[in-house]
Regions:
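Active-site capping/gating regions of soluble enzymes
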Residues: 53-205
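Helix-rich catalytic cores of soluble enzyme domains
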Residues: 1-73
Length: 205
């Protein structure tokens, strides 16, 4: 596996048509080179959470970004059955006063993917993008509960998988087993969410 990340900000002016096009082209060229070498490209077009935009704006912009990415991937004759898409979930901006429920996050995210991603794509691995561990887990869980597509929906988290373990380790540097237990718990919670089997009460067990 290899990964290339294209980053997009949301504001009054961004993402511009030029940035959407240039990032899509770069992701497609990367994917072509990777598949020529017999590897699997992870294609990551990330629309950032930073800003005061609404979830509806995020939905519109993310759909534009993903659609353009796949247009470029097809121009470059990428085997879509041999890639993994790593998108953001549909969320309101971090400074927005228009936060939405996890149910809406799931429904908006699925709407975006169903309208933007070709059916040949086998798997979607979400980035956490600055969500808390619980938010990223709960949102992934509901996406899988409501998933009425053939896409496999899983996670490719950074902070939302590692934060608790790093915090524990920073205060207990010698306690390797304890750090591993904290990390394993978070990984187990995310794995259950990827199956639509997570619930909040499992966090305390």
């Amino acid at each position: 596996f290899t990964k290339w990340r294209g980053v997009y900000n949301i504001s009054d002016k961004f993402p511009s048509k030029l940035s959407i096009q240039s990032n899509a082209h770069a992701l497609a060229r990367y994917s072509a080179l990777v598949q020529e070498c017999g590897m699997v490209p992870i294609v990551e077009p990330e629309v950032l959470m930073d800003g005061d935009h609404s979830a509806e704006t995020c939905l519109k912009k993310t759909s534009e970004v993903i659609k353009r990415c796949f247009e470029e991937l097809m121009i470059h004759k990428i085997d879509l059955s041999g890639i993994i898409l790593k998108p953001n979930m549909i969320l309101a901006g971090t400074t927005s006063n228009k936060k939405i429920s996890s149910e809406k996050v799931a429904k908006y995210t699925l709407k975006c993917l169903k309208e933007s991603v070709p059916l040949e794509v086998p798997g979607i691995a979400f980035l956490s993008g600055g969500q808390t561990e619980i938010e990223a887990t709960e949102n992934l869980n509901l996406i899988n509960k409501y998933n009425d597509t053939n896409f496999i929906m899983t996670y490719s988290y950074g902070r939302a998988l590692q934060k608790s373990a790093l915090k524990f380790w920073s205060k207990n540097i010698e306690d390797t087993n304890g750090t591993q237990e904290v990390f394993n718990h978070r990984a187990n919670m995310c794995t259950l969410a990827a199956q639509g089997k997570w619930s909040a009460d499992l966090e305390s067990k």
